Structure formats: structure tokens, C-alpha cells
Swiss-Prot record:
Any GO CC annotation of this UniProt entry: virus tail, fiber
Membrane spanning stretches: none
The keyword ATP-binding appears for this protein: no
Cross-referenced Pfam families: Gp34_trimer, Peptidase_S74
InterPro entries according to UniProt: Gp34_trimer, S74_ICA
Description of post-translational modifications: Proteolytic cleavage and release of the chaperone in the host cytosol stabilizes the folded protein.
Region (Interaction with the receptor-recognizing protein gp38): 988-991
Native source species: Escherichia phage AR1
Protein's UniProt name: Long tail fiber protein Gp37
Localisation per UniProt entry: Virion
Family, similarity comment: Belongs to the S16-like long tail fiber protein Gp37 family.
Assembly and binders: Homotrimer. Interacts with the receptor-recognizing protein Gp38.
């Protein structure tokens, strides 16, 4: 039962104020006096409005005066009658037809017809017949819409439909333009422009493109066409230059164009006058013009160059600088263009070269080839320059002559002889052989000896005939290779020289003259005289009275009535006297080039001749002595020979300074004699005999040094080969040479005992070298047998070294060794081998060597080197192993151990294949075929193997790296999965998130808003390549790193613009999700609270 409190009204005079749920009990009333509204609280705790203002039912008529304002829908079941205007500011919706007796007008400017099917606007006549219709078919979605206009023609019992497409196309059965039709595009079968008036154009396409430039908007597209589906498409457009044609789906390939100035341009080729038919085009390729047939015309080559082509053959190359003929070039005259049978008109040149610019003043100054005049062809080369014929074959003029008028013929042989040749022939008055006139010199080809400055030589096929030359000294000479005939010869200062004879039949055949005297060589009967002229008649005078020199031509006797010279006298009593300074006087060093009072010069290639220079014959004794030279050896000899050929002997003075005498040589009056057997006899040896007779040197030497033994106080020098000193001893006796110094034994060489050993021994140092009885060699330094050699080996007795040297490591830096090589100071980049061996395989080669040595490089300690490789050349393989002072061993290729390898770990605990590192139970151990185990301090940590591994549903592989049970992989760097073909599979992932490693904590703000900018996707993701190398894809789901990077870039790693793929920290996204969930949780809690309160109000109101 309601209490008094519950039926009281809570009041409010504030417009729009509603009571709070907390101030009303369920069913309690409140009133807003300003709004005239009652409120209560339902059993749900919601505040609800009461009264008609909030709804209700009215049964009966309602008469209302005043304005009626309603917010919401109005539903009328019945007839709506209106006597005044109907003003509607919203939308009037009717479900039936609207029939108006008058007009339906819209002042807003729009009339909309809407339908899920075809929308219509119809036009009917009074008989309700369709005149026309505007309709738009249903094309739902993102499609091109169409509006059609259909017009009836009842007279022709037909209709026409005009279609307007949303893509701008207009289609009509027929279009008639009374004046013109303007449209960007027309699709039709034909355009008829009959009955047009004067000055009308069939097509008027005046585009208003702005700006006027070579861009897309400045192109007027005129026509596009093709002949069938799939065929080539052609486009005709108007651009700034003119009309242009293209092919392709768009303006892809330029074809050809007409320019506004009248030019025509083609992108490929032009064919003119080819055989009939549409398919015959130029086959000369791009940038060509075909004339008449498809492979004759012009073909562009490069910038400024083009070819003329005839039947596919390039014949001329035209360029800015020249025209090149690529085939035989023929210049001729023709009246019909096909043959050259008609000569040209008079004074007509087949080719004219304009050469008058140098003002050469020859004719019209032009060069004319094939100039026809008087029935003959002439060729004129004009100009002030030079006509050059630079051919190895030269210039051939056949037949004809070469006239040089007002100039000269210059022949420049350059570094060869300049030659003019006169060809021989076998007819007429021609010479038989070729004859040449050559001009040359040898001062350049042989500067050290050449003295022929200028030579002009006449030759035929046999040899040279004559030449005239100037020497480097200035003289001029003329030589004839044969006889020389002349009616008279006048010789200048150089005279006449010949290797043949000078022949003259005149009595006075030769005259030598000067202004005062002349000398005439005169043949008179049986004699030849040399006769001087009278004084003053040297050139033309006759012979004088003197006869100073005559030769009897029958006997050869020379008659010189009076012979006198400055230093020589030929006396009538038979002697020749050389007075004054004889020829050849001077030092020995100049004698080869000097003469002598009696001088003979021998020039003979024979090798077995004797040339005497002085000879004396003793007639009574019938013997002859001569002095001369044997030219085979150059030996000067003194020779004796009897008339009967006996007693022929020769004493020789040889070029090497030795002298050979044929028998004993006696000195003085015979007191000393050198015998043929080498013995010397002399009376100086008498003092060494008891009888006083002459003794020879052999006996004297034997007397001086006793054969039985003696002491020499002087030096003994043996200059002899072979066994110059022979020691002879009995069987088993010693045989040696010993040296005593100061009366004490010092050394000996020889056999010192009963065996056949040979020694070299020092008594003082007790060191020696001994060749044993079996041929071994022993070296005993300081009395100790340390080294022993035989044919197989070198043995070193190391006990001597250990007896005198320490074996501790600490002193090795300054100790020598049994084999010790001190190279001294060497270069800073050098290698010196200490021991080297070499061998080759029989019949195979592969000469190889192994050596151990020392290498030095700049500013560091030495390296020990073992070199193994070829000994044939520097290119075949060789391996160099380096041992460094810091313990580093460098191996160029591979270290191969039989089973175990230790790197500072001592003896491995494992007996099989292993590598220990640091200690003997840490390293890599072979775990079977294709498997390696990693072990640390005996604990098996991990393995890798080529064996097959399978994880059902995830992956399988034939090779893997794994840890053993309970072991872990710990990384102090990144763990990176490089390839996009594979993934990382784990049971759980624990990411370090301790607050102790974090600072500057800031909670997310507006997390939901940030999260709303990130989308989740399903997608196909790259998964490596398949067996054929194609990209594989697999379905996946997740986020896009770029989207996350846009709001939280700190969660993304990688270069978005480079090739590095972006990596996303999904844990950071979890933090964002958590913050967004927290925001949603708070909002949901607040909404739940408000809902509960509203439920209570509604519940109270409904009671």
C-alpha cells in the first residue's frame, strides 16, 4: 500500500529537467510544471514519462483548433481530404499511383523516378497510346548506367531507341545533322555527307586543347580503326606538327605523319612504285625508301649517312663529308638511261670537280674526267696542289708519253732508291731487258762507313752499267762497269778511275797537263814513252825532246835514263839505298796501318800458300833462302831449300810469340845448345862434375837434388799436369805428405796406416777429414768423430753435442744446433731454405721439392717455412706451411689428422675421430656417419647431423643442429631467421620482461584508438621456393608491420625503403592489446552500472 510519501509529487520548474532515479521510489510520481510532464520509476529502476503526451489511445472524434505540430510518423487509415494548400517540407511517400488533373511541378528542379527494376518516364496520347518513353534499365552495382529514349513511329509501324551511356557514349540508329554534328566520339557503320553546301567540311574537328604543347591534352584524336577482332589497331591523331598515325591499343607505336609544312615522316620505311598488290613493302628495313622493287632504294645508316641499295646490295654510302662507292663506279653518257653506246656532245665532261678556287688559271680551273673533244676523251687534273698516286704498283702509261712542260719530274724514293725504269720488250727497237736509272746514297743506311752521298746509277737485268756519284768529301766520280770509248776524254781534278782498261788507238793516247807543262803517253813503234811537252804548251803542245821513261813493248824492259827520289837511290852497281826517314817509322802500335821501305800487302783467300817477300838464291850451292808468310796461320818463316828439293827446313815465328826451329839451337859459338828433345848442353855445368867435361842439364839437376832423398831450402813449384808428383810406397806402408812447423808435427795428407784410408789431419787441433777403407768420409772436428758420410746417408754423432751443450728450453735462443746455418743480415722480404730435397717420377715427371727454411718480413720475428710443391716452374702448385713465432700455424689448404686433433687440449680422452680444444675432454667428437657431437668437460651438449628428422605436422629435414636433453642455446646477440622459407617452432617463448631492466614507464593513452588503426589480416605468405624454383605461398594470419610502425615505430625493426624486410615485436602489440582491454573493461563496468540503475527505474514504473 502506497504511503503518503509515495503519492506526493516531486516538482520541477526547469524545462527539460527529469528526476533522478535516486529521488523516486518505484511508482512514485514527479511533475515538470514547465513542460507539463509526469514521471515515475518502474520496477527496473528506470525513469519513465506518463500522460497522453507520451502516448495513448483516443476513442472518438477530436476537434482541434490551432496549429498541429507532430514529430514522428503519421499513419491514416481512410481518406485524406484537404481544402487548402498542402505544404510539405519532408518527403511524401505513396504506395499507389498519383493522378493529377493539372500539372505536377517541382520548384526544386528535380524529378526522381526510382525502381529496383527499370525506371520509366512515359509520354501517352489521349488514347493512352505510348508516344515515347524515357527509361533506364536496372544495372545494379558498380556498372555503367544507361538512359534510353524510345520514340514510336506509328506510320511506319516502327520505333527508334536512342541510348545515352554513363561512359559518354551515345548510340542512335541514325543521326542527321541539319548543319553539323559535334561530338567527341561517334560509333556508326557509315557517315553520309551528301548534299553539303560549298565550303562545308565532311568532318570538322577543331579541338580547343590548352596549352599548345607536346602533351596528351594537346593531341586531337581523329580516328581509330581495325578490320577484325584481334587485328592490329590504327590511330589517326592531330598534334602540333600535323597528322600522325600510330598502332597498338593506344598511341604505342609511331607509324608516319604529315607535318603542317608539307613534310612526310615514316617510322619504318616508304615504298614507291612497287609491283601491284597491297602486301609488297620495302624489305630494306627501318629508315628506308624502296623504289620500283622491295630491295632497291635508299637505306639510312647513321646520323648523316645513308646507302643506296640495288637488289639488296649496298652500292653507295652518302655522308656529309663524302660519297663512297661500294661497287664498281662507271661514269658514262647515255641518251636513253640504259646503254652507253652514244658518245657525249662536244666539249662535254663525264665528271667535273670544281677546283678553280685556288686560282690555278689552267683552262676554266676545273678538273675534268672523260672530257670529250674532237672524238677523243681527255682528262684534266687542275689545281695548284699536287696530284698524288700512292700505289705500290706505281703509275702505268700505255701507250703514250709523259710531257712535263714548265716544270720538272721529281722522284722521291724516301728511304729507298729513287728509280726510273725503262721496260724491255722483244719487238722493234726496244731494249731486251728492263733498264733503270736509280738515285741513292749510303750515308743514312750505314752512317759509320757510308761515304757515297749522292749516286746516279744505270742498270739492266744483268748488273749496273755505269754510275756517277758525289762523295761526302765533295768529290765527283764516274764509273763504267765495262769498257769506255770516247773520241776524247778530259779529266778534271779527280781523274779517271776504272777497274777495267782504258783503251785508245791514238799515238798520243793520254795527256796529263797543267798551265805550264803536259805529259803525253805516246806509243811509238815498239815502245811506250812518257814525254813532257815544252813549257807553256801543257794543254795543246806536242811532245818535247826528253824521253825520261820508256817501256819496250816486246820485252817489257823499262828504261829510266835518270831515276832519283828524295830518300831512295837505285844504283847501277845493284844496291838500293833508302835514305832519310824510312816509311813506317814510329811506334809498334801503328805498324799494322803503316807501310815500309819494302812493303808487300797480301789479299788472298787461299789457305795453303806461302808468300816470300825477300829471296836469295846461291847458284853455286844450288840453294835458296827466303823470308815470307804462311797465310793459313799468319806465321812469318825463314825457309831453306836445295835445287833438288833436299834440305828443306823452316824456322817459324808464330803470331802467339812462340818460335819453332827445325833442329838443335846453338847459342854463341856453340858453348850452349838446346837439343830437339828439350835437353840443354852448356859448359856452365862443368863445376858440378869431377872430370870437368861438359854436362847436360838433366845430369846437372840429378846431381843437385838427390833421388834418394834430400832437403831443399828453397821453394819448389811444379807446373805440370796429370801425375806431376807420385809417392810410391810398399804394401801396407804409409804414404803421406807431412808438414812440420818449428820442428813439431803440424799436419799431414795421405795414407797414414796399413789400410787404404786417406786422411787430412791437423796435429795441433786434432781435427781431420778421413776417407775410410770402404769409401766413407768421416769429419772429426776437434778430435771427435762427429760426421760420417757414405753414399746413402750423412750420420751425425749427436752425443758430442749433448756433451757440450745444454738441453734446456730457456737457453735455446742463443744456442747452436748440430746443423746450424747463420744467414747473417738479410733483406726484409726474403726466404732462405735450410734443407731442400728434390725428386721426379721415372717416365712421368712431376719434378717436386720439399724444403725447410726461414722467411723474413718487415719488423717482426722470423717464420719457419715448409714448402712442398713443384720444381719445374713458378705456375704449378706449391703449398707453403708457415710456423709463426707466436705459435700460429698457417696451412694453405687442409690439416688432416689420422683420428684425433688437439688445439691446446693435450691428449684427447676419446680414441676415435675428434678435435679437442683447450682441455682433453672439450671439443667436437665424431658421432657416426654424418654426425658431429659437441662436448664440454665430458658433457654432451649438442649435435649436428645429416640424418632425417621429423616433427609431425610441422617440418621434416635431412640435416639439423640440436641440443641434448636438458641443454640450452643461449645467445648474447640476435637469433635471426634469414630465409622466408622456414619458421621457428618452440613449445613456449619466455621473453624477458622484468621491471628491473626497464625504466621511464608510461601507460598507453587512447589504446583503443591506436588499436583501431591496426587491422588483422588473413593472407598468403611467402614460403621459399618449390622444386622448380618457383615462389611458394602458404595461408597465414597476423598484422602488417608498416601499419604498426605508423603508430608504434619502436616495435618494428628494418628499413622500410631498402631490401631489409621489417620485423615486428608482437609482445609490444600484446601490451597495446592489454591496455585497450583495460580501457574496454572500465567502460563496460561503467555501462553495467548505468544499466542496473535504469533497470530499477523501469521496474518501479511498471508496478
Amino acid at each position: 500500500m502506497a504511503t503518503l510519501k509515495q503519492i506526493q509529487f516531486k516538482r520541477s520548474k526547469t524545462a527539460g529537467q527529469r528526476p533522478a532515479a535516486s529521488v523516486l521510489a518505484e511508482g512514485e510520481l514527479a511533475i515538470n510544471l514547465k513542460d507539463r510532464v509526469l514521471f515515475t520509476k518502474d520496477d527496473q529502476g528506470n525513469i519513465i514519462d506518463l500522460g497522453f503526451a507520451k502516448g495513448g489511445s483516443i476513442d472518438g472524434n477530436v476537434i482541434h483548433k490551432g496549429n498541429y505540430n507532430q514529430t514522428g510518423d503519421y499513419t491514416l487509415n481512410g481518406t485524406f481530404t484537404q481544402t487548402g494548400n498542402f505544404n510539405l517540407t519532408g518527403i511524401a511517400r505513396v504506395t499507389r499511383d498519383i493522378i493529377a488533373a493539372g500539372q505536377i511541378m517541382t520548384e526544386g528542379g528535380e524529378l526522381i523516378t526510382k525502381s529496383s527494376g527499370t525506371a520509366h518516364v512515359r509520354f501517352h496520347d489521349s488514347a493512352d497510346r505510348e508516344r515515347g518513353i524515357i527509361f533506364s534499365p536496372a544495372n545494379d552495382g558498380l556498372t555503367t548506367q544507361v538512359v534510353n529514349i524510345r520514340v514510336r513511329d506509328y506510320k511506319a509501324s516502327s520505333e527508334s531507341t536512342f541510348a545515352f551511356n554513363g561512359n559518354g557514349l551515345f548510340s542512335s540508329p541514325e543521326v542527321f545533322g541539319w548543319k553539323s554534328v559535334s561530338t567527341p566520339v561517334i560509333y556508326t557503320n557509315k557517315v553520309i555527307t551528301n548534299k553539303k553546301v560549298k565550303d562545308d567540311y565532311d568532318i570538322y574537328s577543331m579541338a580547343d586543347n590548352v596549352p599548345l604543347s607536346e602533351i596528351t591534352t594537346a593531341i586531337n584524336h581523329l580516328r581509330v580503326m581495325r578490320n577484325a577482332v584481334g587485328s592490329g589497331i590504327f590511330h589517326e591523331v592531330k598534334d602540333n606538327d600535323g597528322i600522325t598515325w600510330y598502332s597498338g591499343d593506344g598511341l604505342d607505336a609511331y607509324l608516319w605523319s604529315f607535318t603542317w609544312s608539307g613534310g612526310i615522316k615514316s617510322s619504318h620505311s616508304i615504298s614507291i612504285g612497287l609491283t601491284p598488290g597491297p602486301k609488297d613493302y620495302s624489305i630494306l628495313g627501318p629508315s628506308s625508301i624502296a623504289l620500283g622493287d622491295n630491295d632497291t632504294g635508299f637505306k639510312w645508316h647513321q646520323d648523316g649517312y645513308y646507302f643506296s641499295v640495288n637488289n639488296g646490295t649496298k652500292t653507295f654510302l652518302f655522308s656529309p663529308s663524302e660519297t663512297t662507292s661500294l661497287r664498281k663506279f662507271v661514269a658514262g653518257y647515255s641518251t636513253n638511261g640504259t646503254d652507253l653506246t652514244t658518245p657525249p656532245t662536244e666539249n662535254y665532261a663525264l665528271a667535273t670537280v670544281v677546283t678553280y678556287h685556288d686560282n690555278n688559271a689552267f683552262g676554266d680551273g676545273q678538273t675534268l674526267l672523260g672530257y670529250y673533244q674532237g672524238g677523243n676523251y681527255h682528262h684534266y687534273f687542275r689545281g695548284k696542289g699536287t696530284t698524288n698516286i700512292n700505289t705500290h704498283g706505281g703509275l702505268l702509261v700505255t701507250p703514250g708519253i709523259i710531257d712535263v712542260i714548265g716544270g720538272s719530274v721529281n722522284i722521291d724514293g724516301r728511304n729507298n732508291a729513287s728509280t726510273a725504269m725503262f721496260k724491255g720488250n722483244t719487238t722493234g727497237s726496244s731494249s731486251v731487258d728492263n733498264m733503270t736509272i736509280s738515285v741513292w746514297g749510303n750515308t743514312f743506311t750505314n752512317p759509320s762507313e757510308g761515304n757515297r752521298k749522292n749516286v746516279m746509277e744505270i742498270s739492266d737485268a744483268t748488273s749496273w752499267m755505269s754510275y756517277i756519284q758525289r762523295l761526302t768529301t765533295g768529290e765527283v766520280e764516274m764509273n763504267v762497269n765495262g769498257s769506255f770509248e770516247s773520241s776524247g776524254v778530259t779529266a778534271g781534278n779527280r781523274g779517271v778511275h776504272t777497274t777495267g782498261e782504258i783503251s785508245s788507238g791514238a799515238v798520243n793516247a793520254l795527256r796529263i797537263w797543267n798551265a805550264d807543262y803536259g805529259v803525253i803517253f805516246r806509243r811509238s813503234e815498239g815502245s811506250l814513252h812518257i814525254i813532257p811537252t815544252a813549257y807553256g804548251e801543257g794543254k795543246n803542245g806536242d811532245i818535247g825532246p826528253l824521253r825520261p821513261f820508256s817501256i819496250a813493248l816486246d820485252t817489257g824492259k823499262v828504261v829510266i835514263p835518270d831515276l832519283e827520289s828524295s830518300y831512295n837511290t837505285f844504283a847501277a852497281n845493284g844496291y838500293i839505298k833508302f835514305a832519310g826517314h824510312g816509311a813506317g817509322a814510329g811506334g809498334y802500335d801503328i805498324q799494322y796501318s803503316q807501310a815500309a821501305p819494302i812493303f808487300q800487302e797480301i789479299d788472298d783467300a787461299a789457305v795453303s800458300k806461302y808468300y816470300p817477300i825477300v829471296k836469295q838464291k846461291f847458284l853455286n850451292g844450288k840453294a835458296v833462302w827466303s823470308l815470307g808468310t804462311e797465310i793459313n796461320s799468319g806465321t812469318f818463316v825463314l825457309h831453306h831449300l836445295k835445287e833438288d828439293g833436299s834440305q828443306g827446313h823452316t824456322s817459324r815465328f808464330n803470331a802467339d810469340g812462340t818460335v819453332n826451329f827445325p833442329d838443335n839451337v846453338q847459342v854463341g859459338g856453340g858453348e850452349a845448345t838446346i837439343a830437339r828433345n828439350g835437353n840443354i848442353f852448356s859448359d856452365i855445368w862443368k863445376t858440378f862434375t869431377s872430370a870437368g867435361e861438359t854436362t847436360n842439364i838433366r845430369d846437372a839437376i840429378a846431381t843437385r837434388v838427390s833421388k834418394e832423398g834430400d832437403t831443399m831450402t828453397g821453394k819448389l813449384t811444379l807446373s805440370a799436369g796429370n801425375d806431376a808428383l807420385v809417392l810410391t810406397a810398399g804394401e801396407g806402408a804409409s804414404s803421406h805428405i807431412r808438414s812440420d812447423v818449428g820442428g813439431t808435427n803440424n799436419w799431414y795428407i795421405g795414407k797414414g796406416s796399413g789400410d787404404n784410408g786417406l786422411g787430412f789431419y791437423s796435429y795441433i787441433t786434432q781435427g781431420g777429414v778421413y776417407i775410410t777403407n770402404n769409401g766413407e768420409i768421416a769429419l772429426s772436428p776437434q778430435g771427435q768423430g762427429t760426421f760420417n758420410f757414405n753414399r746413402d746417408r750423412l750420420h751425425i754423432n749427436g752425443t758430442q753435442w749433448t756433451a757440450h751443450q745444454g738441453g734446456g728450453w730457456e737457453n735455446q735462443w742463443n744456442q747452436e744446433a748440430p746443423i746450424f746455418i747463420d744467414f747473417g743480415n738479410v733483406g726484409n722480404d726474403s726466404y732462405y731454405p735450410i734443407i731442400k730435397g728434390k725428386s721426379g717420377i721415372t717416365n712421368e715427371g712431376y719434378i717436386s721439392g720439399v724444403d725447410f727454411g726461414m722467411r723474413r718480413i718487415t719488423n717482426t720475428w722470423a717464420q719457419g717455412i715448409i714448402r712442398v710443391g713443384n720444381q719445374e716452374n713458378g705456375s704449378d702448385p706449391q703449398a707453403i706451411y708457415e710456423f709463426h713465432h707466436n705459435g700460429v700455424l698457417y696451412v694453405p689448404n687442409m690439416v688432416k689428422a689420422g683420428a684425433r686433433l688437439s688445439a691446446g687440449g693435450g691428449d684427447p680422452v676419446w680414441q676415435g675421430a675428434c678435435v679437442v680444444i683447450g682441455d682433453n675432454d672439450t671439443g667436437l667428437v665424431h658421432g657416426g656417419d654424418g654426425r658431429i657431437n659437441m662436448v664440454a668437460n665430458g658433457m654432451h651438449i649438442a649435435s649436428w647431423s645429416s640424418a632425417y628428422h621429423l616433427h609431425e605436422g610441422l617440418w621434416d629435414t635431412t640435416g639439423a643442429l640440436w641440443t641434448e636433453q636438458g641443454r640450452a642455446i643461449i645467445s648474447f646477440g640476435h637469433l635471426v631467421q634469414q630465409s622466408d622459407a622456414y619458421s621457428t617452432f618452440v613449445r613456449d617463448v619466455y621473453v624477458r620482461s622484468d621491471i628491473r631492466v626497464k625504466k621511464d614507464l608510461v601507460k598507453f593513452e587512447n589504446a583503443s584508438e591506436k588499436l583501431s588503426k591496426i587491422n588483422g589480416y588473413t593472407y598468403m605468405q611467402k614460403r621459399g621456393l618449390d622444386e622448380e624454383g618457383n615462389q611458394k605461398w602458404e595461408p597465414n594470419a597476423g598484422l602488417i608491420a608498416q601499419e604498426v610502425q605508423a603508430i608504434l615505430p619502436e616495435l618494428v625493426e628494418g628499413d622500410p625503403d631498402g631490401e631489409r624486410l621489417l620485423r615486428l615485436n608482437y609482445n609490444g602489440v600484446i601490451g597495446l592489446n592489454t591496455a585497450a582491454i583495460n580501457e574496454h573493461t572500465a567502460e563496460i563496468a561503467e555501462l553495467k552500472s548505468e544499466i542496473e540503475e535504469l533497470k530499477k527505474i523501469v521496474k518501479s514504473l511498471l508496478k
